[in-house]
């Protein structure tokens, strides 16, 4: 009986740990895409700064 209790607790802890890891991975993906879009817009501004179209 004691073995079954330990096994159940171990399985519950394992499932909780995998649930906690999912939001972290999603947040990292959102952060990476935000950094990527910022890099693209900053690169655009750097290349087009001072051009006649940017002065308007």
Curated annotation (Swiss-Prot):
GO cellular component: extracellular region
Expression by tissue: Expressed by the venom duct.
Propeptide part(s) removed at maturation, as residue ranges: 22-30
Post-translational modification (record): Contains 2 disulfide bonds.
Subcellular location: Secreted
Signal peptide: 1-21
Any one GO molecular function term: toxin activity
Superkingdom field: Eukaryota
Swiss-Prot/TrEMBL keywords: Disulfide bond, Neurotoxin, Secreted, Signal, Toxin
Domain-related comment: The cysteine framework is XIV (C-C-C-C).
Name the UniProt record assigns to this protein: Turripeptide XIV-01
Species name: Gemmula speciosa (Splendid gem-turris)
């Amino acid at each position: 009986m004691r073995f079954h209790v330990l096994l159940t607790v171990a399985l519950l802890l394992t499932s909780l740990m995998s649930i906690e890891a999912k939001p972290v991975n999603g947040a990292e993906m959102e952060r990476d895409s935000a950094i990527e879009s910022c890099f693209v817009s900053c690169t655009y501004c750097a290349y087009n700064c001072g051009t006649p179209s940017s002065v308007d």
